Amino acid sequence: MMSKTYHIAVLPGDGIGPEVMAQAYKILDAVRQRFNVRISTSEYDVGGAAIDRQGSPLPAGTVAGCEQADAILFGSVGGPKWEHLPAAEQPERGALLPLRKHFKLFSNLRPSRLYPGLEAYCPLRANIAERGFDILCVRELTGGIYFGQPKGREGTGPHEHAFDTEVYYRFEIERIARIAFESARKRRGKVTSIDKANVLQSSILWRKVVSQVAPDYPDVALSHLYIDNATMQLIKDPSQFDVMLCSNLFGDILSDECAMITGSMGMLPSASLNEQGFGMYEPAGGSAPDIAGKDIANPVAQILSASLLLRYSLGLDDAADAIELAVNQALEAGHRTADLAGGGSAVGTGEMGDIIAALISQGA
């Protein structure tokens, strides 16, 4: 009986996207060989590159290719070249948001960790940074105040006003809570749910539903924090957190705060999943057109995005572990791209990919 072949739709995009994606290909090759798994990839245009070649940021052929795949590995989109276009036709609005909507990607997972040896890049005090941290921010992506109706602006003069509506349904809260609890089971067994239940009706329901889901996961400890306290605690002692469960708005804020305290955005991957486990995986940073093509971009976020893909959509935990271990070992050996070299000697984008791929192949 032949082993299953996994199909990945690869969307390199713009800016540094293609060159960091090239390093992800090296990592997938190493995984194929070491773990004897069958992984095929098909590449499609997206973003500005798709506008230039096909006249649309998200061509129908790209969507069709993604529909045939088990997961999407996404690079980055956008750049000054396309900023003159109407907002809905620009790479970000015209590609990322429609992909999320089309595949019903309701959950966003953003890991943020401080890697050993990179404490100097953390903006927190040394006595806080030295404790390290490894946080997974689980954000609800399709509900809440960004999508609630009604929203709009009315009136003129002193009576001109604007309004947005925060709406959460029980099923939306329950399904994102289960993602957080399941994730905590694979980590350190702690979920901190973030809300504003002392003021907001939507947060009162959020806390109620999360608390009702918790007994299904007796091996996971649940605690609750108000959003204002959570932002303070994240600065005071990030090591206390494992999985942070957030609504759309609160997760938007906290996931960026988590990213910033690592001091190394080029290291951070993200995953967006639907209820079937289908996902889109991408670096948390942008397309960085100013450094594109110079072999100086940090490919680790793209490589770790591939690791998340293997773990969450393909169920290949051993391969994902091997990638993460190889990244750790490369950093511990002192290999740094320019963003982390601090003026010292730096390796290029391609060399960093080669180093990590070799560590995977060697058994890391």
From Swiss-Prot:
Binding site for substrate: 100, 110, 139, 228
Pathway: Amino-acid biosynthesis; L-leucine biosynthesis; L-leucine from 3-methyl-2-oxobutanoate: step 3/4
Subcellular location: Cytoplasm
Coiled-coil region(s): none
Cofactor: Mg(2+); Mn(2+)
Single GO MF descriptor: 3-isopropylmalate dehydrogenase activity
Binding residue positions for NAD(+): 79-92, 286-298
Pfam annotation, one family: Iso_dh
Site note Important for catalysis, residues: 146, 196
Biological-process GO terms, alphabetical: L-leucine biosynthetic process
UniProt signal peptide: none
Reactions accelerated catalytically: (2R,3S)-3-isopropylmalate + NAD(+) = 4-methyl-2-oxopentanoate + CO2 + NADH
Principal subcellular localisation of the protein: cytoplasm
Xref: InterPro entries: IsoCit/isopropylmalate_DH_CS, IsoPropMal-DH-like_dom, Isopropylmalate_DH
EC number(s) from the headed UniProt entry: 1.1.1.85
Keyword terms: Amino-acid biosynthesis, Branched-chain amino acid biosynthesis, Cytoplasm, Leucine biosynthesis, Magnesium, Manganese, Metal-binding, NAD, Oxidoreductase
Cofactor remark: Binds 1 Mg(2+) or Mn(2+) ion per subunit.
Binding site for Mg(2+): 228, 252, 256
Top-rank EC class of the record's enzyme: oxidoreductase
GO cellular component terms listed in the entry, alphabetical order: cytosol
Purpose: Catalyzes the oxidation of 3-carboxy-2-hydroxy-4-methylpentanoate (3-isopropylmalate) to 3-carboxy-4-methyl-2-oxopentanoate. The product decarboxylates to 4-methyl-2 oxopentanoate.
Subunit and interaction comment: Homodimer.
Protein family membership: Belongs to the isocitrate and isopropylmalate dehydrogenases family. LeuB type 1 subfamily.
Name listed for the protein in its UniProt record: 3-isopropylmalate dehydrogenase
The gene coding this protein: leuB
